[in-house]
């Protein structure tokens, strides 16, 4: 009997050029997951040695490039939010709040929400470039920054194939925040002065994002433990890791907010996330 032949994994070109197929995308992501670990390690190594290399060099003048970079991410986030948020509200109005993070509906299989949800996950790879701008411009790379970028990237990639329903909230919140945040950073890159409350507002909406996420994850833990919503699309491995991740984000950003705006040690500093 001839051995069964295994079909080759789908490629990035397949996902981008062929009609949307969740099976095809999952096939591609199965090969991208191991690569994501290598990318994360390369990212951390580049930060370390990049700072060493820049220690005795003049900072690069990347003002216009950085502005375009941030405007690009703001535009991408705005378009993705426009494509994904209406579906969230549709499920919310039709089936209620709990259903919006328990029921998948056709979130992953629909050609529009499926593609833009996947595009969001993949965007976390180029977002790592935010840190390279800090390194090349000899700006501080604080723990909160690289920890958030690295962990969000790997978590998004590794958990994609789980097709969790709560992702519609995670993506909607993150994209809404990033649309505003990256636009702000683009404006600041051009040395355009903004009122101090704007920076405070950016950090505040980041914290609100994590508060909402922590609430949803907390409720999902209760739902999963009591099996109060049969068929709720959430798994323990994703829930436990994601819950700890969001709690750590909330702690770090709240601590930053306290130091930057309550203790008033850094009058012009704002946090930059993914």
UniProtKB/Swiss-Prot annotation:
Catalyzes the first and rate-limiting reaction of the four reactions that constitute the long-chain fatty acids elongation cycle. Uses malonyl-CoA to add 2 carbons per cycle to the chain of long-chain fatty acids. Condensing enzyme responsible for the elongation of palmitate (hexadecanoate, 16:0), also involved in polyunsaturated fatty acid (PUFA) biosynthesis. The chain crosses the membrane at residues 29-49, 73-93, 115-135, 140-160, 170-190, 201-221, 238-258. It is an enzyme of class 2 (transferase). Keywords: Fatty acid biosynthesis, Fatty acid metabolism, Lipid biosynthesis, Lipid metabolism, Membrane, Transferase, Transmembrane, Transmembrane helix. It holds the Pfam family ELO. It is found in: Membrane. GO terms for biological process: determination of adult lifespan; fatty acid elongation, monounsaturated fatty acid; fatty acid elongation, polyunsaturated fatty acid; fatty acid elongation, saturated fatty acid; lipid metabolic process; multicellular organism growth; regulation of gene expression; reproductive process. InterPro entries: ELO_fam. Disruption phenotype: Suppression of ELO-2 causes an accumulation of palmitate and an associated decrease in the PUFA fraction in triacylglycerides and phospholipid classes. This imbalance in the fatty acid composition results in multiple phenotypic defects such as slow growth, small body size, reproductive defects, and changes in rhythmic behavior. Suppression of ELO-2 decreases growth rate and reduces brood size. Expressed in various tissues and parts of the body, including the ventral cord, pharyngeal muscles, uterus, and the tail, and most strongly in intestinal cells. One of its GO terms (molecular function) is fatty acid elongase activity. It is a multi-pass membrane protein. Its EC number is 2.3.1.-. The lineage of its organism: Eukaryota, Metazoa, Ecdysozoa, Nematoda, Chromadorea. Belongs to the ELO family. It catalyses: hexadecanoyl-CoA + malonyl-CoA + H(+) = 3-oxooctadecanoyl-CoA + CO2 + CoA. Pathway: Lipid metabolism; fatty acid biosynthesis. GO terms for cellular component: endoplasmic reticulum membrane. This is Long chain fatty acid elongase 2.
């Amino acid at each position: 009997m001839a051995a069964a032949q295994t079909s080759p994994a789908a490629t990035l070109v397949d996902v981008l050029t062929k009609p949307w197929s969740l099976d095809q995308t999952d096939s591609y992501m199965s090969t991208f997951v191991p690569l994501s670990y290598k990318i994360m390690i390369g990212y951390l190594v580049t930060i370390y040695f990049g700072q060493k290399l820049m220690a005795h060099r003049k900072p690069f003048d990347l003002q216009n490039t950085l502005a375009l970079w941030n405007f690009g991410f703001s535009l991408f986030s705005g378009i993705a939010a426009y494509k994904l948020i209406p579906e969230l509200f549709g499920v919310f109005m039709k089936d209620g709040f709990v259903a919006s993070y328990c029921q998948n509906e056709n979130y992953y299989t629909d050609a529009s929400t499926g593609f833009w949800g996947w595009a969001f996950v993949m965007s976390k790879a180029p977002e790592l470039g935010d840190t390279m701008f800090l390194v090349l411009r000899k700006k501080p790379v604080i723990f909160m920054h690289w920890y958030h970028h690295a962990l969000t990237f790997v978590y998004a990639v590794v958990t994609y194939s789980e097709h969790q329903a709560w992702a519609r909230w995670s993506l909607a919140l993150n994209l809404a925040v990033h649309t505003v945040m990256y636009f702000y950073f683009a404006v600041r890159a051009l040395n355009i002065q903004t009122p101090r409350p704007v920076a405070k507002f950016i950090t505040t909406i980041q914290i609100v994002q994590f508060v909402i996420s922590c609430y949803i994850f907390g409720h999902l833990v209760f739902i999963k433990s009591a099996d109060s919503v049969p068929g709720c699309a959430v798994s323990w491995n994703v829930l436990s890791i994601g819950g700890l991740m969001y709690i750590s984000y909330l702690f770090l950003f709240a601590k930053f907010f306290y130091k930057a705006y309550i203790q008033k040690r850094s009058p012009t500093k704002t946090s930059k996330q993914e």
